[in-house]
Amino acid sequence: MKLFNTLTRQKEEFKPLVPGQVSMYVCGPTVYNYIHIGNARSAIAFDTIRRYFEYKGYKVNYVSNFTDVDDKMINEAGAEGTTVPELAERYIQAFLEDTRALNIEEATLHPRATHEIPAIIDFIQTLIDKGYAYEADGDVYYRTKKFADYGHLSDQNIDQLEEGASQHVNDEEQGRKEDPIDFALWKGQKAADEIAWDSPWGKGRPGWHIECSVMSTKYLGDTLDIHGGGQDLEFPHHENEIAQSEAKTGKKFVNYWLHNGFVTVGKDEEKMSKSLHNCVTVHDILKNVDPQVLRFFMASVQYRSQINYSEENLEQAANILGRFKNTLEGINYRLADATEGLPDPDLAKLVTETTAKFEAAMDDDFNVQNALTAIYEALPAVNSNANAEKADKESLRLFAKKLAAWLSVFGLDVDKLLAKEAGDDDAVIEELVAQRTEARKNKDWAKSDELRDQLKEMGVVLKDTPQGTRWSRE
């Protein structure tokens, strides 16, 4: 299996620290609002990666944090007239509700920054003791230039970074920082009513970057197999995590850095951002969009690629899901009949070849498009066999099992996919389908067509097969 490592800018063979196990940390949301589709894209991308590791037999220790204190949290709590902990709890629950709807597996652990304050203080003190950090009027800053490898992950020169940073340092920080490029590890309390914790440097709260260094190494060890997040986190967040963690431990922090692509919106493929006021929340989308369609749409694009959120692309995803559903329904319908099966060597070979193509694609840095193409190209032959006079039932049964496993990698539950929406008119539909079957048996084509039209007006789609007529709702 090969992964594209942002640190080296190339694909590398995946070699876990412990054979058969994967330690994986993914930056979670700052919980001051409902998650938008950019947040969902990252969560779904890394959930798909996690699921494929599990499909391959790995045990995955997956840690994803909640940032439950920072400037955004404080500002939003003030605007809503609530406390930071109350705001965090509300949106953590909203996050869990949205991710459950999208069938995102819950993390092995969801640590919260505010629950890790003692560990954060200890981590910062170690950096001070080693000369990598310094206290200034209640704040603590990281001495960036002391870390020789700074800028490696984002492929940037530290002198250029320093020049850019000097233009963004406010007057208040100017007198405290040794260098404009230094960043905050601990922020001293600015107002008496501002959320804060006691520390050796006075009351205050942790900086954003230190939170992830502490939580990842506390729960996964000094060196991680994989660290994931959006491309927007590559700098400065992940760059700063490396500087903090490696300065403290003296060890390589992460072996494989993975970053997912951005989400664009609409026909113009405009980058989604709060500043452009084009953010769409999952909470709002799911009022009108089937969660399985949204999940499949987001999972069907390779994680490093940009993805465009639009009604047309959602509709295309729904159509592909419909093809998978029809194939599974056809197989199940055929397996339930009493006819004797007939082995088909070509179909058995196709199942084996499709499995190999699917895994080869996913082993190549999780190339989901090629994996889906392999499945999609197998459907016509499978459907044809399911509708044949004598089907290869064993191969059909195996393909259905494989397809369920493949779709599970994409976060789809086959049982939910195949579940028919119960309606008050189901019995009526069954009766009309039976009447039409009788009319066809009697070669009463006019009556058969009349019943088909009646069912169509009721939103029912019919499919005639040698084994009988199947129906589904549009």
UniProtKB/Swiss-Prot annotation:
Its UniProt entry gives the catalysed reaction(s) as: tRNA(Cys) + L-cysteine + ATP = L-cysteinyl-tRNA(Cys) + AMP + diphosphate
Q: What is the organism lineage in this UniProt record?
A: Bacteria, Bacillati, Bacillota, Bacilli, Lactobacillales
Primary site of residence: cytoplasm
Q: Where is this motif: 'KMSKS' region?
A: 271-275
User: Annotated Gene Ontology MF terms?
Assistant: ATP binding; cysteine-tRNA ligase activity; zinc ion binding
GO CC annotation: cytosol
Supply the source organism for this entry: Lactobacillus delbrueckii subsp. bulgaricus (strain ATCC 11842 / DSM 20081 / BCRC 10696 / JCM 1002 / NBRC 13953 / NCIMB 11778 / NCTC 12712 / WDCM 00102 / Lb 14)
Q: Which residues bind ATP?
A: K274
Q: Which CDD domains match?
A: CysRS_core (cd00672)
ATP-binding keyword on record = yes
> What protein name applies here?
Cysteine--tRNA ligase
Q: How does it assemble?
A: Monomer.
- The entry's Zn(2+)-binding residues are C27, C212, H237, E241
